Amino acid sequence: MTEIPSIMLIGCGRSKLQEQSPARDLYTGSLFRARRSLAEEMGCRWFVISAKHGLLYPDRVIAPYDVTIDGLSVLDRAAWFPVVTSQLIDAIEDPGCFYDDRDLRRVTIEIHAGESYASRLVETLRAAGFTAFHPVANLGQGKQMEYYAVRRRQVGYSRIGAGRT
């Protein structure tokens, strides 16, 4: 059975629509779509992480842009990771929050993004008290797509099995 994380953070993508759209729809690349599909099938809360905007709720409408984490200055890049962590804590601590357990140690976060985003973000989130990991670390795009296909099947099987009990 596949464990479902509390939250998935999904890296944005280079391929985008050309008009303002909700973050969930703005990014059109196959890797983003595979990540989004997994999060939605798992039924877990998910956000987009963006070099320009930080943490994005999927329904937040934004305009297309061309900013990457590697394109940020050294200072801006260093500041980005704690900003995203703070935004995530704010989302969890919001009184109308989706998540009842405010103990960060019990919040499991999966980061599905490129190494430039994920490796340092895992460290920053763990330092803040979260349980965070990057399940597709060091995998190329093809292997990541395979991972998402297999994991989606596992989620489907888990749901079928759960329905029989």
Model-predicted regions and their roles:
Residues 1-165:
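Peripheral peptide segments
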